[in-house]
Amino acid sequence: MKKIDVKILDPRVGKEFPLPTYATSGSAGLDLRACLNDAVELAPGDTTLVPTGLAIHIADPSLAAMMLPRSGLGHKHGIVLGNLVGLIDSDYQGQLMISVWNRGQDSFTIQPGERIAQMIFVPVVQAEFNLVEDFDATDRGEGGFGHSGRQ
């Protein structure tokens, strides 16, 4: 298992609010919690930034972290990430903040310590562009959206 440096920015993390952990041995994501002093009501269509009370430094440029919505919050309540997916670069060292968007029909209240997003670590390949005049021919060519049909 890869070690990632984490800094606790809010003393409640690790005491009142558990540190992120994998729920099962097969879990891909670590749940991130709302490190709030008071509940925050999010009206339909509203967004807000929610602190996690944590900072990470991945340090390894071959890794990045991605913040993703929790499936139950999105499906049952319309609560997703305001930026859809959050990307954490390996050299970022600031607090993890979660952009939360209520795309649902009803107001939703985020409680202090509530699990509101999940974070996964992914491999990164930094590419270098090779300028060419033309590409080698492929079966697909320039076929874009919907080119292969629906069935």
From Swiss-Prot:
Cofactor: Mg(2+)
Entry superkingdom: Bacteria
GO BP annotations, alphabetical order: dUMP biosynthetic process; dUTP catabolic process
InterPro entries from the UniProt entry: dUTPase, dUTPase-like, dUTPase-like_sf, dUTPase_trimeric
Reactions catalysed according to its record: dUTP + H2O = dUMP + diphosphate + H(+)
Pathway: Pyrimidine metabolism; dUMP biosynthesis; dUMP from dCTP (dUTP route): step 2/2
EC main group: hydrolase
Keyword tags: Hydrolase, Magnesium, Metal-binding, Nucleotide metabolism
EC number, UniProt record: 3.6.1.23
Keyword match Magnesium: yes
A single GO molecular function term of this UniProt record: dUTP diphosphatase activity
Residues holding substrate: 70-72, 83, 87-89, 97
PANTHER family for the chain: DEOXYURIDINE 5'-TRIPHOSPHATE NUCLEOTIDOHYDROLASE
Subunit details: Homotrimer.
NCBIfam families listed in its UniProt record: dut, PRK00601.1
Similarity section: Belongs to the dUTPase family.
Biological role stated in the UniProt entry: This enzyme is involved in nucleotide metabolism: it produces dUMP, the immediate precursor of thymidine nucleotides and it decreases the intracellular concentration of dUTP so that uracil cannot be incorporated into DNA.
Name of protein: Deoxyuridine 5'-triphosphate nucleotidohydrolase
Gene: dut
